[in-house]
Amino acid sequence: MGGYGSGRSGGWPTVEDSLSLNLPRLFKTGWLKKGAWTSGILRWSIVGTGEEIASIGFEARLGEKDGYVRLHWTSTNRWSGEKRQCENRIELTTRAQPLGGRRWWFVCLHTGKLAERLHLPSGAYTFACRKAYRLAYRSQRETPRDRALSGAFALRRKLGADGGIGDYVTKPKGVH
């Protein structure tokens, strides 16, 4: 009772537990292109295992200063098994930058605000900004003690350790 990870469960969903659309990443990977029509299937998978957890079809049409992304998928209610066809049309717009150029933004379907990332928590049917769903980051929901332990485990993973907090970690090459 009261061990690591046992506090503050439940409550509002977190960003990490949601499907996320990252606009800069969509441009960087070529899924979105200014002045072009693109389409495809976006896939999400579990990082450790590679198991696919979701896929969403999309089509996008972008002009010089605005455009849209249309997403379509089937959602299954986890309790009743009922399937529902979902579709979101998300507007895109740009804003001039102080040093020149333009930056692309999603227009949130719930709040109308500009966002770089949109999220779809479990059970929701529309992608929206973090504020619309009251999403926090997982670390914000941890107790100070658990947050410190999470940081220690993350640092140990970076150093190549895979065991518990008491396992020996060798020094990385080049560290004296």
Descriptions of predicted regions:
Residues 1-94:
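N-terminal alpha-helical interaction blocks
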Residues 66-70, 103, 124-126:
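A generic structural signal for beta-strand entry/edge sites
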Residues 89-102, 117-123:
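Short, flexible, mixed-charge glycine/proline-rich loop motifs
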Residues 107-111, 122-135:
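Cysteine-rich micro-motifs
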Residues 115-121, 139-142:
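Short Cys/His-rich "knuckle" micro-motifs
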Residues 133-149:
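Short metal-binding segments enriched for Cys and/or His
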Residues 154-175:
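TOPRIM metal-binding catalytic domain and adjacent DNA-binding surface shared by DnaG-type primases
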